[in-house]
């Protein structure tokens, strides 16, 4: 049985030497991410609400990536405390930025301009704020509205858009699986069509992933 095991990781994370912590993460298809980052326009990574996203974000920052994550402002106190504790233990985590879902997108534009890897989950259960851009997709036979705002910003900024999933492994280890390039802004002439195509691929990949890893579901 696989679990998210993020809260279990929090019990030991501030006791781990940096080298040991970095070694807990395996990145599949990392050259795809490195190539995207090397273009110099930032990179968007489309995630899903499955797996220990916060843990992997911390470990990616320790590997040297300039990372920005979009989160809910009402995030739990435990996660905020862990973030603070690790900021003190690993000063290099200062390069990791936190953006809140209810803010307007100018900070996301700035992150792409500064070469950050911006990560967010698009598969929301409901759209909370009226200013958020969405795209209708079909997943598990149902029509759902998923968030498309960061993807649109990435295309406008010239930032490649990738998709990735987090898979837990034994011994507090994690695997970040970079699936594919969802959108390459160098070839985009029609933003709406590019977003529609990328979102369709994103939804298909999420459905495939959930069927393969049902134990990572956190709510029915």
Q: What is the predicted function of each stretch?
A:
Residues 23-27, 50, 98-102, 143-144, ...:
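A conditional alpha-helix N-cap/helix-loop micro-motif detector
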Residues 39, 62, 66, 70, ...:
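Non-catalytic C-terminal accessory region of glycerolipid acyltransferases
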Residues 44-46, 69, 95-99:
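Short catalytic-loop micro-motif centered on adjacent basic/acidic residues
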